[in-house]
């Protein structure tokens, strides 16, 4: 049974910008279906917005392919909106999705989130699940 998680945008962005490193390993595991990701319309919209920013110089084609993979392989959920204090409100969608799905939140910005056992770095996630 595949491991399940929510991926913060920084993990997706890092995977798209570099084919090496823990974020790339995680995205490869999503593509080969050994990891399932939970997504929502808000999360997919955030991914697309960030990947499309001009200064990252990611082609529209690559953004489209990435979003298509995420939509095709992701588990679409509708999550509750919490009132948990957040350092950055734009991170709430990922926190709330992980809480609602009762799964891991994988992020390179652990410090942006409340201290919770389900929040983990890409390196920690890869070590814990032998990715």
Task: Please give the residue ranges for each predicted region.
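Active-site neighborhoods of divalent-metal-dependent phosphate/nucleic-acid chemistry enzymes
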Residues: 71-108
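A secondary-structure boundary/capping signal
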Residues: 7-9, 39-40, 109, 121
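Intrinsically disordered, low-complexity and often Lys/Arg-enriched segments
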Residues: 1-3
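Short, well-structured alpha-helical segments
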Residues: 60-71
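PIN/NYN-family metal-dependent endoribonuclease catalytic core
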Residues: 6-7, 17, 22-52
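Membrane interface segments of multi-pass transport proteins and intramembrane proteases
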Residues: 56-57
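Acidic, PIN/NYN-like endoribonuclease modules and their adjacent C-terminal/linker elements
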Residues: 92, 103-104, 110-131
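Residues at secondary-structure transition points
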Residues: 21, 38, 61, 85-92, ...
């Amino acid at each position: 049974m595949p491991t399940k998680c929510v991926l913060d945008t920084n993990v997706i962005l890092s995977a798209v910008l570099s084919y090496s490193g823990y974020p790339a390993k995680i995205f490869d595991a999503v593509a080969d279906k050994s990891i399932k990701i939970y997504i929502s319309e808000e999360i997919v919209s955030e991914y697309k917005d960030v990947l499309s920013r001009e200064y990252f110089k990611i082609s529209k084609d690559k953004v489209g392919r990435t979003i298509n993979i995420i939509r095709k392989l992701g588990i679409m959920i509708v999550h509750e909106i919490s009132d948990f204090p957040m350092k950055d409100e734009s991170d709430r969608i990922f926190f709330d999705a992980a809480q609602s799905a009762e799964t891991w939140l994988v992020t390179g910005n652990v410090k942006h989130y409340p201290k919770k056992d389900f929040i983990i770095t890409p390196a920690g996630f890869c070590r814990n699940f032998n990715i």
